[in-house]
Amino acid sequence: MHVFNFLLFYPIFMSIYWIVGSIYYFFIKEKPFNRSLLVKSEHQQVEGISFLLACYNESETVQDTLSSVLSLEYPEKEIIIINDGSSDNTAEIIYDFKKNHDFKFVDLEVNRGKANALNEGIKQASYEYVMCLDADTVIDDDAPFYMIEDFKKNPKLGAVTGNPRIRNKSSILGKIQTIEYASIIGCIKRSQSLAGAINTISGVFTLFKKSALKDVGYWDTDMITEDIAVSWKLHLFDYEIKYEPRALCWMLVPETIGGLWKQRVRWAQGGHEVLLRDFWPTIKTKKLSLYILMFEQIASITWVYIVLCYLSFLVITANILDYTYLKYSFSIFFFSSFTMTFINIIQFTVALFIDSRYEKKNIVGLIFLSWYPTLYWVINAAVVIMAFPKALKRKKGGYATWSSPDRGNIQR
């Protein structure tokens, strides 16, 4: 019965935790800072930022991202783009673009993964602050000012991660991911911030202190998700990571089931790889914030495999002719589904209220997707089942290369 209670109440507990954490974070830490009151005249003596753009087969998007960074008002900046052995014409597009624009270009012949590309690019960085961007990202003009301001206020920061938004919302998958980033990912980052440690920066858009990256050994070339891996290394070296919701960027998301599935399996595998690698170092830190973060990861994996075992047991022992058994099972399923959906609608409403501060949404068009957080748990379970065995088989010391990304329908 205790196991059944865990199966039923763990997702409900986590959703409530995210709701309460998001509300508290918003009113205590987020709302007092009005994003419309950024006075750029106060930032005349700004710190320089080196923008790193690592790309692989990004011929359709890289020019937009370069144009976005070049057009930023931020006065002290340099741009370093790294082509990681692309098999398409990405390099040719960059060389052609460079004829009329000033930036550094590192053209690697062999694809050895994003982490290796970033490690090569940072060697060319002149400034102490390094902004890492994906090659499909368009940045809000105010974002670098907000992020550099956070570093000035807190010398313990090793990284400030921004608030990614979705560019391609024309498809149902695009709309669903818009909901996910607002009602789940945004809520998780706010709640984890209150606990004192964020599980991962957003690899698509984060500002690092270069000296902090040097201390932790930069990015790990053998980890499938370099952003999660470097986040935990920063925590273990006593650096803090801040979530800056005012720093906006717009990115492209997968718009095919296959592309989305590959992305989520990779994310989950990366989280599991880090958990396996950093379990004992985390235990030795005796830091409550990291214990909470690690417990959340372990509990989620445990929940998935208990669900799998429980469902398998039910299938093996079920008697389809036993009316009482079927009625009981259906009533429990109905109760848990109704409760979870009700809580997730609350979570969606809270997230929509908070998120409207940064991006106006078509509420009528999105309300019917408020059921998605419930489906999120089902998708997460399937992804974990696929990803955890992959993490166990990680090859240490190699290169975690990347494949051509699914960028969906580019909307200019």
Swiss-Prot record:
Localization, per the record, is: Cell membrane
Q: Which GO terms describe its molecular function?
A: acetylglucosaminyltransferase activity
Q: Knockout consequence?
A: Complete loss of the intercellular adhesion phenotype.
EC number(s) on file: 2.4.1.-
Transmembrane regions: 7-28, 298-320, 332-354, 364-386
User: What GO biological process terms does the UniProt entry carry, in alphabetical order?
Assistant: cell adhesion involved in biofilm formation
- Source domain of life: Bacteria
Entry annotated with the keyword Chaperone:
no
Spell out the CDD domains in the cross-references.
CESA_like
Extract the NCBIfam families matched here. PgaC_IcaA
Which family does the similarity line name?
Belongs to the glycosyltransferase 2 family.
Q: What does this protein do?
A: N-acetylglucosaminyltransferase that catalyzes the polymerization of single monomer units of UDP-N-acetylglucosamine to produce the linear homomer poly-beta-1,6-N-acetyl-D-glucosamine (PNAG, also referred to as PIA), a biofilm adhesin polysaccharide. Requires IcaD for full activity.
Query: Gene behind this chain?
Result: icaA
* Its membrane topology: Multi-pass membrane protein
Gene3D superfamilies linked to this entry: Spore Coat Polysaccharide Biosynthesis Protein SpsA, Chain A
Main localization is membrane
Q: Which InterPro entries match?
A: Glyco_trans_2-like, Nucleotide-diphossugar_trans, PGA_PgaC/IcaA
Task: State the protein's name.
Answer: Poly-beta-1,6-N-acetyl-D-glucosamine synthase
Which keywords appear in this protein's UniProt record, sorted alphabetically? Cell membrane, Glycosyltransferase, Membrane, Transferase, Transmembrane, Transmembrane helix
Q: Which GO terms describe its cellular component?
A: plasma membrane
Query: Pfam families this protein is in?
Result: Glycos_transf_2
